[in-house]
């Protein structure tokens, strides 16, 4: 009997796939036989991630793409579809942090710097992938990386929280509208996870002493903690799973 998690022949796109949660997604997908395409804006990090992913024996493609640039997303998606003829799953993961001096002191430029990547970029990426999934006639799986900031107030981070809340709403709307085309869409709410974006804060004694005791599993998340959910949501095992918000946080938001 074949495994429901066998991704042989599956083409997966992971934005921000060169580190952190995105690399965790990509590693799980590659380990289960998928062809993996990673997008990122840092060529060296892309190259290093692709080299590591190729150790699983499958095809890995690295591409420079700034998801906040709509024309770049359109071109990069067309390149992926042209090369492989399909996109079976798209992990809308690329994002940037946001921390303003204060809410009233937040500038228009700072607001749009975060929304440009986290929300506009997610829209461009998901829209192009859904177009391809509908056109190929087989549907596919869209997965958004959200955050607890979508639910809980983050001081000086109103722009970041708004962007992550928007992803949940976008995901649910895609799930409802495009189910008839076989497109599923789900969002993942990630807890405190080691990454280039978060590690400087997580590794300080003061932050660890304040926050880590509130994580029931008593550790920070790692990219590898997101490998399994990526495989599940990409595979046929999740064929009846859409419109959901899945929390992976070590129990933090339950405490």
Residue positions per predicted region:
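The beta1-alpha1 cofactor-binding region of Rossmann-like NAD(H)/NADP(H)-dependent oxidoreductases
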Residues: 43, 64-76, 108, 225
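Active-site helix of classical SDR
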Residues: 126, 163, 171
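Short C-terminal tail/terminal secondary-structure segment
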Residues: 2-4, 97-100, 152, 217, ...
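Short, small/polar-rich loop/turn modules that mediate ligand/substrate recognition or access, typified
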Residues: 179, 184, 241-243
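Substrate-binding pocket helix/loop in short-chain dehydrogenase/reductase
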Residues: 101-103, 107-115, 211
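Conserved glycine-rich cofactor-binding loop
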Residues: 11, 18-19, 42
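Residue(s) in the substrate-gating loop at a strand-loop-helix junction
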Residues: 147
């Amino acid at each position: 009997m074949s495994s429901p998690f066998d991704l042989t022949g599956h083409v997966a796109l992971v934005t921000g796939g060169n580190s952190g949660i995105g690399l965790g997604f990509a590693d799980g997908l590659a380990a289960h036989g998928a062809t993996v395409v990673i997008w990122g804006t840092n060529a060296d990090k892309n190259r290093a991630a692709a080299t590591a992913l190729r150790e699983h024996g499958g095809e890995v493609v690295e591409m420079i793409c700034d998801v906040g640039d709509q024309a770049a997303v359109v071109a990069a998606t067309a390149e992926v579809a042209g090369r492989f003829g399909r996109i079976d799953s798209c992990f809308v993961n690329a994002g940037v942090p946001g921390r303003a001096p204060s809410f009233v002191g937040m500038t228009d430029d700072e607001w749009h710097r975060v929304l440009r990547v986290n929300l506009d970029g997610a829209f461009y990426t998901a829209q192009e992938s859904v177009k391809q999934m509908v056109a190929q006639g087989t549907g596919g799986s869209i997965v958004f990386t959200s955050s607890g900031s979508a639910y809980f107030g983050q001081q000086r981070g109103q722009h970041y929280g708004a962007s992550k809340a928007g992803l949940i709403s976008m995901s649910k709307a895609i799930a409802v509208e495009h189910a008839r085309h076989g497109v599923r869409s789900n969002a993942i709410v990630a807890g405190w996870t080691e990454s280039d974006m978060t590690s400087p804060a997580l590794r300080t004694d003061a932050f660890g002493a304040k926050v880590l005791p509130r994580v029931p599993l008593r550790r920070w998340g790692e990219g590898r903690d997101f490998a399994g959910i990526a495989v599940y949501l990409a595979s046929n095992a999740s064929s009846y799973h859409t419109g959901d918000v899945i929390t992976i946080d070590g129990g933090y938001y339950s405490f």
